[in-house]
Amino acid sequence: MEDFSFEARVLNTPYEKADVYHSLSMPVYNTAAYEFDSAEDMEAAFCGRTTDHAYSRITNPTVQYFEDRIRMITGAMGVTALNSGMAAISNTLMAIAYSGANIVTSRHLFGNTYSFLLNTL
């Protein structure tokens, strides 16, 4: 896929995971929780010992497909999709800053960004 043009990668990124209803395109999984065969399987998923989806705020098939598709299209090493502006801002700031770091900013920021900087970092 790397040899294809950007447009070809966008249009031809395959849907490789068949769902139980044989959908031709990736279905939207609008659920919060997932069923497990046993308590041990559930524990393994929540502890990250498997790639199973455990809870949609952590991951779900739709978001994983989107991240994989963006990674394939762009050639990025990894992609993290977030579902709100504040999630994107807080994740970015936590990746580049640390507690006690000096950050110069205005009070006029998106949502609770100023409060996040003041009280969390």
Label the model's feature ranges.
Residues P27-V28, G78-T80, A101-N102:
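Structural motif
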Residues P14, A32-A33, S84-G85, L93, ...:
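Fold-independent oxyanion-binding glycine-rich loops
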